[in-house]
Amino acid sequence: MSLSFASAPKTEQQPEYSQIVLDTFFPVINLNHMRQAMRIDNTITSVRLYEMALEAVIHVNRQLALTKQRALMAGQQTLVQTDSKLPEIRYRHAVYNYTKANLSEIYADYDATGKTASRFESKQQSADDYRREAHAAIADILGVHRVDAELI
């Protein structure tokens, strides 16, 4: 008797969808690394991940536009030059988490087992959690508090 196990398909991006470079000031986003770090399986196609990550990069870059402008005026050509390695790490964290939030929302009603109603709420909560993580990463880059609260 022999046992045979089906191997899972590879979760690598197609080469033309493996990186996002919109602006040389900000770090390159490696989508193969994102897949591994955020546990994005092969049910998300290369094109879909690329599109969702592109939206996240645009969103994060807009939030950091003033930071970029100030850095360029100070003679710094990249986000990494503004400080230690921390801004690059936080930038990646923001992009990865916004991407995962977008994917969680889009695929909230997708479930191969047919239990979509019970999983919808938990996936929506996950999307909110990913967004909160991304917001915290951007707040760290900007040097502002992560939470704004006012006593009424």
Feature names for model-found ranges:
Residues 1-80, 143-152:
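Conserved short "hinge" loops at termini or chain/domain junctions
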Residues 2-7, 18, 46, 84, ...:
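Generic serine detector
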Residues 79-88:
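Short, glycine/alanine-rich amphipathic alpha-helical segment
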Residues 87-152:
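Short loop/turn elements at secondary-structure junctions
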